[in-house]
């Protein structure tokens, strides 16, 4: 059994999931993950069957939000739950439930984090491969350039697959932002706090135009760019 399946907590935020969510969960369980925190971020009644199914597995804890609070809030609540419920866990692995993150890549990121101990491990896709939607390529290139201005060289600025050592979780719970901007703010705070990161290459998965993902490559990339401009202005 892989180390991270016992020593790490999966944190999975979800809003109105589809069957891809069930397949992701099945993959985690088949791999032997013992601790899975799922945050239902205000999903409607039509999608509750997926969370009801998750609750039947002893490895899963489902935290409901009364109304949509945003991915950032869901992640922070997931971190808090991991700290409180699993005191022996050595870190968390954040993933998305839309099928973009393959089980073997989740394990690779988790195990690398356990080996490196103090580095956040980011699962990074290759946007130069054929078949990647043009808007995703453009959005990532734009935000990558902005991160370089801040002194952060990162090939996949929008990755939701992140393996985080336990010692950083309390601080990450204090990072501003309740929606997609939170993940950008986390990277900026890592730079400010001197927290290092490693990039772990992962499979680049885009199926059915990523139906099930709530990330808008154009709109949310623009939001990230505005955050970066504000950060650069405040730093100067």
Residue map of PLM features:
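A conserved hydrophobic helix/loop-capping motif in glycosyltransferases and polysaccharide synthases
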Residues: 8-17, 24, 31
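Short beta-strand-to-loop acidic/aromatic patch adjacent to the donor-nucleotide binding site
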Residues: 86-100
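Short beta-strand/loop segment that forms part of the nucleotide-sugar
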Residues: 33-43, 63-65
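Short, high-confidence coil segments that cap the C-terminus of an alpha-helix
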Residues: 33, 87-89, 117-118, 195
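Hydrophobic helical membrane-anchoring modules
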Residues: 1-4, 19, 26-27, 149-151, ...
